[in-house]
């Protein structure tokens, strides 16, 4: 099952009404002038019909070597969806790539072929690296990412601020975005140490010409602090619950459409 969750530009939503954000934050993209990003979230459905979190099934899939196949399936779905959008659409999708896929040369060939054959504007596709495990060989990962960047694909370093997504990865990996790890965002209102750390991360990322996405935003106070701090975008249940991809009228997001930079 594929769900999607909005990643909202802070410039568009910092003065928004809290009730509107809680109701359907993604609709605020309609009045925005920038890129409208959505993260694709994969969920398994159990025999009882309940959704199973990636924290449960991803480690199992990694152990049995299934993650490259799962990643390829999700990428295929993303490309098919993007191919249905108008040429002037502002919508971009972010898709998680597993460590196993980053180390697999055959996956690189298959993904490159899928992208080249899709006919989509490749900058609309953003791969997030490092969700649940440490990036294995930085050399292999960098080579993988550089090959896809030549096709126009962009990359985000996920969970930045954890032991796995470290500052050294900004030196070695060709990324365009950093996503600040959610536990640092969740405690912003109580922890001056976390506020200092997040502010430093934002400054570092911008000095490297990277955009900053804050994850797990759960209050209006946190949202406005992040906007004042200079973070570029925010994501979290406060801004929009994950919904099925087909439930969102993405064509409505072509209002005041601009090209994806």
Say what each PLM segment does.
Residues 2-6, 92-94, 235:
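PAS and PAS-like sensory modules
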Residues 3-58, 78, 176-178:
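A short, well-structured catalytic beta-strand-centered motif of the EAL phosphodiesterase domain
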Residues 15, 24-31, 43-49, 98-105, ...:
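EAL-family c-di-GMP phosphodiesterase catalytic domain
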Residues 29-39, 45, 64-140, 216:
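Catalytic core of bacterial c-di-GMP phosphodiesterases, primarily the EAL and HD-GYP domains
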Residues 40, 56, 60-61, 70, ...:
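Structural preference for long, well-ordered alpha-helical segments in enzyme cores
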Residues 111-114, 143-151:
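Catalytic-core regions built around general acid/base machinery
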């Amino acid at each position: 099952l594929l769900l999607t969750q909005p990643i909202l530009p802070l410039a568009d939503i910092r003065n928004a009404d809290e009730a509107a954000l809680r109701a359907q934050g993604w609709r605020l993209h309609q009045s925005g002038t920038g890129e409208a990003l959505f993260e694709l979230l994969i969920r398994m459905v159990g025999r009882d019909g309940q959704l199973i979190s990636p924290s449960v099934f991803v480690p199992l899939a990694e152990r049995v070597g299934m993650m490259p196949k799962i990643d390829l399936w999700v990428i295929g779905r993303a490309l098919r969806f993007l191919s249905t959008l108008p040429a002037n659409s502002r919508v971009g999708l972010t898709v998680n790539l597993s460590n196993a896929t980053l180390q697999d040369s055959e996956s690189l060939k298959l993904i490159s072929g899928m992208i080249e054959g899709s006919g989509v504007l490749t900058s609309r596709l953003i791969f997030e690296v490092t969700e649940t495990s440490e990036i294995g060989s930085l050399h292999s990962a960098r080579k993988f990412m550089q090959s896809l960047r030549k096709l126009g694909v962009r990359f985000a370093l996920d969970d930045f601020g954890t032991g796995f997504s470290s500052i050294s990865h900004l030196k070695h990996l060709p990324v365009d975005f950093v996503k600040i790890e959610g536990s640092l965002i969740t405690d912003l209102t109580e922890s001056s140490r976390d506020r200092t750390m997040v502010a430093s991360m934002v400054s570092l990322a911008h000095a490297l010409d990277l955009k900053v996405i804050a994850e797990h935003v759960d209050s209006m106070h946190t949202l406005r602090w992040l906007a004042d701090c200079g973070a570029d975008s925010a994501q979290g249940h406060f801004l929009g619950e994950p919904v099925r991809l087909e439930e969102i009228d993405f064509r409505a997001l072509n209002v005041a459409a601009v090209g994806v930079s």
